[in-house]
Amino acid sequence: RSTEYIAILKKILNLLKNSKLEYLKASDESNLSKDKRHFNLQSTLRNRYFQDVTKLLRSLNVEVENLVIHRLNFEQMVISSIKKPNHTHLHKSIELDQNLLRLYDEALELNSAAFVLKTHREKIAESVSEGIYFLENAGFILES
């Protein structure tokens, strides 16, 4: 049970890192300063969540340094964005965040006392809603 929880937290870490990068790219891609600020804030939040989950893993005596340096997922992310050039970085951020929500749900099923995860989940869910609203207003259609 504990190893399953740790495995989920590691997946969350990886997605948070990728989500942070996509929000930075979305900021670069954007022309409006208010949108740039919003995307930079989301990136900063993902970085903070990353630090929180890292602390959580350390509290479970998991060595985190080795974990953080996985290039494989970043390369997979780059390859998948090449396959779908019509997807914006925000769209990719939303996809990553939706995957994060599923992982947070799994982690919370295994440890409902992890309040920091509940807080992250709520904020990310808000961000997904805002992102979808933003894309719909910009004329994008999201497949669910």
Regions found by a protein language model. Give the residues of each.
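Alpha-helical bundle segments that constitute or directly flank the non-heme di-iron/ferroxidase center
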Residues: 1-30, 87-112, 126, 130
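Hydrophobic alpha-helical segments of small multi-pass membrane proteins
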Residues: 73, 123-124
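Conserved alpha-helical segments that form or flank metal/cofactor-binding pockets of metalloenzymes
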Residues: 36-68, 131-143
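Short, highly charge-biased, low-complexity peptide segments
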Residues: 61-65, 115-116, 123
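Membrane-interacting alpha-helical segments
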Residues: 1-6, 81-86, 138-144
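Short, charged, amphipathic alpha-helical segments
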Residues: 36-45, 91, 117-123
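Inter-helical turn/loop segments and adjacent helix faces that build the functional surface
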Residues: 25-37, 106-119, 141-144
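Carboxylate-rich helix-loop segments that flank metal/cofactor sites and access channels
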Residues: 55-88, 95, 99
